[in-house]
Design a protein with these regions (language model features):
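Core nucleic-acid recognition elements
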Residues: 1-164
């Protein structure tokens, strides 16, 4: 069974979100009311007890992070998209999480994949005539096509890599 967690820095600690909001304004001319950055973890082969321990130790720091399971709150009209590493690309965050979960229970062999989810709220069009144009510009700014891609599909049934 694949479990999904989203981890977001609390507003006072959301440095990456503030940086992206400034970059959108300065480089793209897009003014947004709010920008959120969440780290998405898909987790498989982890028992319930280990999973509960890992939520507050491996995947998040409770004093500075908000953790959401399976989905996260967003408002109608928010533009949400997710960026993941290309298949075969090394994912250091996921690898570190796998190693840390193994320290909690060395009998388990977790498979973890991470991605970054962006939520853009309250954009004032400005120079952009069509909503899809500014959305495309933001996605292009956040996705490095050399190592990553947009990943907005449903949660996978398994995280095991299959090579046909």
């Amino acid at each position: 069974m694949v479990r999904r967690i989203f981890v977001e820095k609390k507003p006072a600690f959301a440095v990456k979100a503030k940086e992206l909001k400034n970059e959108m304004s300065e480089y793209l001319g897009i003014e947004a009311e709010d920008v959120r950055v969440l780290i998405r973890y898909d987790i498989e082969n982890v028992g319930d007890e280990t999973y509960e321990k890992a939520k507050g130790t491996v995947f998040s720091e409770p004093p500075v992070d908000d953790l959401y399971e399976e989905t996260f709150p967003c408002k109608e009209g928010d533009f949400c998209f997710t960026v993941e590493y290309l298949p075969g690309q090394f994912d250091q965050r996921a690898d570190s999480a796998e190693q840390c979960v193994c320290l909690l229970n060395d009998a388990e062999h977790p498979i973890i994949k991470s991605a970054t989810t962006y939520v853009i709220s309250g954009v004032k069009s400005g120079k952009w005539k069509v909503e899809s144009e500014w959305q495309e510009a933001v996605v292009k700014h956040c996705v490095n096509p050399v190592d990553s891609r947009r990943a907005d599909g449903p949660k996978p049934a398994t995280l095991e890599d299959r090579f046909d």
